[in-house]
A protein has these predicted regions:
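A short, N-terminal "cap"/entry segment at the start of jelly-roll beta-barrel domains
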Residues: 1-35, 48
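Conserved short histidine dyad/triad with adjacent acidic residue
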Residues: 37-52
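Short, surface-exposed secondary-structure edge patches
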Residues: 38, 58, 73-75
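Short beta-strand segments in beta-sandwich/barrel cores
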Residues: 46-47, 64-69
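Glycine- and acidic-residue-biased ligand/ion/polar-headgroup-sensing regions
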Residues: 54-66
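Ligand-binding loop in jelly-roll beta-barrel domains
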Residues: 55, 87-111
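Short acidic-glycine-tyrosine-enriched beta hairpin
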Residues: 73-87
C-alpha cells in the first residue's frame, strides 16, 4: 500500500491531547489494526502529556524542531530523529523555533 498524505485533507484539532494551539492531522490509515498519520504543529503549539494505553507510538520528525517530554525527561527533537513511546508510557511534544514541527506518527494497536 502506498500512502499519499497530500491527498488527505487535514483535520484541525485544537489543544491536541490537552496541548497548546492546534494540530493539523492527516490520517491515511485507520483500519482497526493501527493508525498512520502526519501531524503538523504550528510554532507555539504542542501535544499535551498523555499515556499510551492499548498501543505504542513511533514518531519520526520530518521537519522542524521541538522537545519531547518522554517519561519525565526532556529530549530535543530535530528532523531525521525518531521517538518511540511504548505502551503504558507517557509523552508530549512542544514545538521550538519559528517553523512548524511536522511529524509522521505510527500507532499499531496492541490487541
Amino acid at each position: 500500500m502506498t500512502l499519499d498524505f497530500n491527498a488527505v485533507d487535514p483535520t484541525v484539532v485544537p489543544h491536541f491531547k490537552g496541548g497548546a494551539g492546534e494540530a493539523h492531522v492527516r490520517t491515511a490509515v485507520a483500519d482497526g489494526m493501527g493508525r498512520i498519520l502526519t501531524l503538523t504543529l504550528p510554532a507555539g503549539s504542542s501535544i499535551g502529556l498523555h499515556t499510551h494505553t492499548g498501543n505504542c507510538e513511533i514518531i519520526h520528525v520530518l521537519s522542524g524542531c521541538g522537545v519531547c517530554h518522554d517519561d519525565g525527561m526532556d529530549v530535543p527533537l530535530t528532523a531525521g530523529m525518531t521517538h518511540y513511546c511504548p505502551e503504558g508510557h507517557t509523552h508530549g511534544i512542544d514545538t521550538t523555533g519559528d517553523a512548524p514541527l511536522v511529524l509522521l506518527g505510527i500507532l499499531p494497536d496492541s490487541k
